[in-house]
């Protein structure tokens, strides 16, 4: 037996079959972000798109994506967000998908596919055969976004059906590798403030370029505030109040025959110092590991040749009760990623570890900035998976 200090202990019992506490896979095909994307197209009468969620039909649809606005967080702060909470009183949540992180969730929204179908499988994933990671937020000029994520986007499919599309988000994201991967074929409107985001979305809805319009608006400051200050902080609550006002102002300026939907890419939990397991301080967790991908609450662990079984056994032993640790084949079989296209399977770690509770596997030397975050996400817990689906219509 190996302790969390990395030292081997005498065996005190026979090795048992691994039976982790259950982490339920997202309900792909019934109530997840990719289902929302397809249903959104169906609501605009795009042929061939499954209307899983039964969204109201309209000529114009706006999807406001608030990064980090988990369902449980919203319900716990009703006084801070009265407008959104009023909508939530007659609505419910859907699930983000795994891992519950921006790269994966925005790609699910942008393609209508589960993570295993679009291949954007985490914050950092292996580039198979190259011995290096792709950080999908920062991207790498060596990687072609179209080759990495080749599926047609919802914006391309909408355009083929005569629907005008617009994506309103920070100007800094225009042309990024991630944007080109999940938002190809869209009219990108870069903004610098909440006011510009609101006005830009309303102007796009009223543009009259086509008889049907789809607008996606993305706001990321709630997530960044949660990362740096924590979701239990005053700063996070103040930022939530700004988000509530943003949604209210956007709603008051909707044109006729329009539907506004509000959702998020994931929730968030605060991780205390005593809940952090540092792989850079525990040699046993680094043994046999070629690359450490994913993020602190959803790890892709890529083993050196021939070491996958040993890495799996060690991670299970050291992280028992704190992380659910599966092999690649087990994670796929459990449905964590949805149906996985064969060409994307090697991007998944030889070992996949998802957090229970508030645990996190950090890497203080290799990932100093990420390891210092207070708010984190990525796993399959309810706090991270459930996101709101709020709807307001002028139809």
Language-model segments: what does each one mean?
Residues 222-260:
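A long, amphipathic alpha-helix that forms part
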Residues 9, 14-48, 76, 81-92, ...:
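His/Asp/Glu-rich, glycine-adjacent segments
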Residues 88-106, 285-305:
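A short, conserved beta-to-alpha structural element at the edge of catalytic cores
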Residues 268-294:
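Acidic/histidine-rich catalytic neighborhood
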Residues 67-68, 266-268:
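Active-site metal-binding loops of divalent metal-dependent hydrolases
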Residues 290-395:
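Active-site neighborhoods of enzymes that stabilize oxyanions during catalysis
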Residues 61-69, 77:
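A structured, charge-rich N-terminal accessory region that forms the first stable segment of a protein
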Residues 63-65, 214-218, 261, 352:
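Structural motif
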């Amino acid at each position: 037996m190996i302790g969390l200090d990395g030292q081997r202990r005498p065996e005190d019992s026979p090795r048992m079959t691994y039976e982790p506490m259950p982490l339920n896979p997202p309900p792909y095909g019934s109530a997840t972000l990719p289902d929302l994307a397809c249903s959104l197209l169906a609501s605009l009468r795009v042929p061939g798109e499954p209307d899983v969620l039964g969204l109201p039909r309209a000529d114009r649809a706006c999807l406001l994506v608030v990064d980090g606005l988990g369902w449980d967080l919203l319900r716990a702060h009703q006084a801070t967000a009265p407008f959104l909470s009023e909508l939530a009183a007659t609505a419910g949540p859907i699930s983000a998908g795994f891992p519950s992180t921006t790269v994966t969730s925005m790609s699910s929204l942008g393609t209508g596919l589960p993570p295993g179908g679009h291949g954007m499988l985490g914050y950092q994933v292996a580039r198979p055969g190259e011995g290096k990671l792709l950080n999908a937020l920062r991207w790498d000029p060596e990687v072609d976004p179209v080759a990495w994520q080749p599926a047609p986007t919802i914006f391309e499919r909408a355009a083929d059906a005569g629907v005008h599309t617009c994506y309103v988000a920070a100007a800094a994201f225009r042309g990024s590798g991630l944007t080109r991967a999940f938002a190809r074929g869209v009219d990108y409107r870069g903004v610098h403030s909440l006011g510009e985001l609101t006005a830009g979305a309303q102007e796009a809805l009223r543009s009259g370029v086509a008889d049907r319009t789809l607008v996606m608006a993305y706001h990321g400051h709630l997530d960044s505030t949660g990362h740096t200050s924590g979701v239990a902080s005053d700063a996070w609550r103040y930022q939530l109040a700004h988000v509530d006002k943003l949604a209210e102002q956007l709603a008051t300026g909707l044109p006729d025959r329009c539907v506004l939907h509000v959702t998020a890419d994931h929730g968030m939990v605060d991780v205390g110092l005593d809940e952090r397991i540092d792989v850079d301080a525990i040699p046993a967790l680094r043994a046999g590991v070629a690359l450490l991908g994913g993020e602190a609450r959803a790890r892709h662990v890529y083993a050196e040749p021939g070491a996958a079984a040993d890495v799996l056994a060690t991670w299970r032993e050291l992280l028992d009760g704190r992380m659910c640790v599966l092999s690649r084949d087990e994670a796929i079989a459990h449905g964590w990623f949805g149906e996985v296209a064969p060409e994307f399977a090697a991007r998944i770690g030889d070992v996949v570890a998802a957090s229970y509770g508030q645990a996190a596997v950090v890497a203080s030397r290799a990932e100093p900035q990420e390891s210092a975050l207070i708010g984190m996400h990525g796993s399959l817990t309810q706090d991270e998976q459930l996101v709101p689906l709020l709807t307001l219509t002028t139809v």
